[in-house]
Regions:
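Conserved two-metal-ion catalytic palm core of "right-hand" nucleic acid polymerases
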Residues: 1-69, 73, 79, 90-93, ...
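Right-hand nucleic-acid polymerase module
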Residues: 2, 95, 99, 124, ...
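A broad, low-specificity signal for short, low-complexity segments enriched in glycine/proline
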Residues: 6-13, 101-105, 147-151, 233-237
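Conserved polymerase palm-domain catalytic core
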Residues: 18, 33, 38-137, 141-160, ...
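Short, intrinsically disordered/low-complexity patches at protein termini
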Residues: 24, 72, 159, 207-208, ...
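Conserved phosphate/pyrophosphate-binding and hydrolysis machinery centered on Walker-type P-loop NTPases
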Residues: 26, 103-104, 108, 259-266
């Protein structure tokens, strides 16, 4: 299935518009963020950001199949196979086959191609009109020079999605006026500054907070020293932020460092991580926690996001010479 998806994405990539950035070789998050951030007059534009609710599982297969057939007209056997796969209502759940509305099977490699294909017409419409727009699977952002024009384009999106049997997640809709911060794909942009989005900062801080509490309980239960608990915290977040050799998830370094041009959010995360480490090492939230010095953290293996960020860009500058 992975090989089939790879071949589909490569062979039929010309079907897709350049304003689509999901699951495309050499045309992904970095290209999306930079295209938007460096668009002429971007700081004078109004924006609208939307997230399609439960996109993969909500795509009506009966509406998708005609699009798929048109996309691969010279592959009747492949279309027949994919049709049977998509129309089969049975799924495995707890080892049992049960009927379910599965859409295009979120989590299946094939779903990435189908998710790109289903809204390709919307992408093409915005491209044809030369309207600034970007889509990454179920995330859409559009821009316009006036509030009235923005509303007109928003209505096109709402109407198109309704015709496609899709809904927008109202909790993830946002609008901005010229000069205000807009967010797309985890990056916040304002006045030429690209930073980690506030929600992404809060998510990593929440993970640090939960891990600190878990390690405190573990240390109490196993009679582990505070310093060893702090060392465990450092090991976990070094792996999550920088290394991650086991998981397929992108680390912070791989995802954010090429995209941002400020260390503002990294300073905030560093400061919070150091608070957690001090709390674990000293078993206190008071000022006495500062008796555990930064040099001691480094001896335990702590790596600052800010330092690693500047090292990354220093190496990149050297590679560009």
């Amino acid at each position: 299935m992975k090989l089939m998806t790879h071949l589909l994405l490569r062979r039929y990539d010309p079907l897709f518009s350049p304003n689509l950035y999901s699951f495309r070789a050499g045309h992904g998050v970095k290209e999306a963020v930079f295209t938007l951030a460096f668009s002429p007059n971007i700081d004078k534009m109004w924006s609208y950001k939307a997230d399609i609710s439960n996109y993969f599982n909500s795509i009506p297969v009966e509406r998708l199949l005609p699009l798929l057939q048109s996309a691969i007209p010279d592959e009747p056997e492949l279309f027949s196979f994919l049709s049977r796969l998509l129309l089969d209502p049975m799924v495995y759940s707890d080892g049992r086959l049960i009927p379910d509305e599965k859409g295009i099977m979120a989590g299946c490699p094939l779903s990435t191609f189908l998710a790109n294909l289903y809204l390709a017409g919307l992408d093409a419409l915005f491209l044809k009109n030369n309207w600034l727009y970007a889509r990454y699977s179920d995330d859409i952002i559009i821009f316009a020079p006036s509030q009235q024009e923005l509303q007109s384009r928003v209505e096109i999106i709402h109407r198109t999605l309704a015709e496609k049997g899709l809904l927008i997640n109202p909790d993830k809709e946002s609008r901005t006026a010229p000069g205000e911060q807009w967010v797309f794909l985890g990056i916040a942009y304002q006045g030429g500054i690209r930073d980690v989005a506030p929600v992404s900062v809060e998510k990593i801080k929440a993970k640090m907070r939960r891990k600190t509490r878990a390690l405190q309980r573990w240390a109490d239960r196993k009679h582990v020293s505070g310093v060893n608990a702090a060392k465990a915290f450092i090991r976990v977040f070094n792996r999550k932020l920088f290394e991650n050799p086991i998981s397929n998830d992108l680390t912070w370094a791989r995802w954010f460092f090429p995209l941002i041009n400020t260390d503002r959010s990294l300073q905030e995360i560093d400061h919070y991580a150091q608070q957690c480490i001090r709390t674990l090492a000293t078993r206190t939230h008071t000022k006495a926690a500062y008796n555990f010095r930064y040099e001691q953290m480094k001896e335990l293996g702590y790596v600052s996001l800010v330092n690693r960020y500047y090292s990354f860009h220093s190496r990149k500058s050297g590679d560009d010479l």
